[in-house]
């Protein structure tokens, strides 16, 4: 898979920190735990050994996943983007035309999306609808349960 992954500087650093923690702290700790469990004798009935090996497998898989994501990542600096239009990295404040409720969305790459914290993927229906729009423009987003009508009230890049 050679697709490049757009990422904010913050998202890239977060993945890098997790990778460093796994390599420098978690991996050595699990190797030590396996060695200690191995010292307890018969491995066929050694629950500690099997649990440690399972955890090691998970850690190694996550390390490979993070290395692949970071290798494909390209960091987009929001300060170098046209600030007048919604683009990757933008924080967009909208008002729901029907309910007059204000919401804020932070447009990020798919690997950084966290809906509970207002971070939505640029590939999501909301992200796709907002990209390229300007303050004052209205967008309609058709979700499975409901249609949302938003007006963009501000765009910022931090």
Swiss-Prot record:
<comment type="similarity">
    <text>Belongs to the GreA/GreB family.</text>
</comment>
<dbReference type="InterPro" id="IPR006359">
    <property type="entry name" value="Tscrpt_elong_fac_GreA"/>
</dbReference>
<dbReference type="Pfam" id="PF03449">
    <property type="entry name" value="GreA_GreB_N"/>
</dbReference>
<dbReference type="InterPro" id="IPR028624">
    <property type="entry name" value="Tscrpt_elong_fac_GreA/B"/>
</dbReference>
<keyword id="KW-0238">DNA-binding</keyword>
<keyword id="KW-0804">Transcription</keyword>
<protein>
    <recommendedName>
        <fullName>Transcription elongation factor GreA</fullName>
    </recommendedName>
</protein>
<dbReference type="InterPro" id="IPR001437">
    <property type="entry name" value="Tscrpt_elong_fac_GreA/B_C"/>
</dbReference>
<keyword id="KW-0175">Coiled coil</keyword>
<dbReference type="GO" id="GO:0070063">
    <property type="term" value="F:RNA polymerase binding"/>
</dbReference>
<dbReference type="GO" id="GO:0032784">
    <property type="term" value="P:regulation of DNA-templated transcription elongation"/>
</dbReference>
<dbReference type="InterPro" id="IPR036953">
    <property type="entry name" value="GreA/GreB_C_sf"/>
</dbReference>
<keyword id="KW-0805">Transcription regulation</keyword>
<dbReference type="InterPro" id="IPR018151">
    <property type="entry name" value="TF_GreA/GreB_CS"/>
</dbReference>
<comment type="function">
    <text>Necessary for efficient RNA polymerase transcription elongation past template-encoded arresting sites. The arresting sites in DNA have the property of trapping a certain fraction of elongating RNA polymerases that pass through, resulting in locked ternary complexes. Cleavage of the nascent transcript by cleavage factors such as GreA or GreB allows the resumption of elongation from the new 3'terminus. GreA releases sequences of 2 to 3 nucleotides.</text>
</comment>
<dbReference type="InterPro" id="IPR022691">
    <property type="entry name" value="Tscrpt_elong_fac_GreA/B_N"/>
</dbReference>
<feature type="coiled-coil region">
    <location>
        <begin position="47"/>
        <end position="73"/>
    </location>
</feature>
<dbReference type="InterPro" id="IPR036805">
    <property type="entry name" value="Tscrpt_elong_fac_GreA/B_N_sf"/>
</dbReference>
<dbReference type="Pfam" id="PF01272">
    <property type="entry name" value="GreA_GreB"/>
</dbReference>
<dbReference type="InterPro" id="IPR023459">
    <property type="entry name" value="Tscrpt_elong_fac_GreA/B_fam"/>
</dbReference>
<dbReference type="GO" id="GO:0003677">
    <property type="term" value="F:DNA binding"/>
</dbReference>
């Amino acid at each position: 898979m050679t697709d490049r992954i757009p990422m904010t500087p913050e998202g890239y650093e977060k993945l890098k920190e997790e990778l460093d923690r796994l390599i420098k702290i978690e991996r050595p700790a699990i190797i030590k735990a396996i060695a200690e469990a191995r010292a307890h004798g018969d491995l066929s009935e050694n629950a500690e050994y099997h649990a440690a090996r399972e955890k090691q497998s998970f850690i190694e898989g996550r390390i490979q996943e993070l290395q692949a994501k970071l290798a494909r990542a390209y960091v987009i600096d929001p300060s170098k983007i046209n600030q007048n239009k919604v683009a990757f990295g933008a924080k967009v404040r909208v008002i729901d035309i029907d309910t007059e409720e204000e919401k804020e969305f932070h447009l990020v790459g798919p690997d950084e999306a966290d809906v509970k914290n207002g971070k939505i993927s640029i590939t999501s229906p909301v992200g796709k609808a907002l990209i390229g729009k300007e303050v004052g423009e209205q967008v309609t987003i058709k979700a499975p349960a409901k249609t949302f009508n938003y007006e963009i009230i501000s765009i910022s890049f931090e």
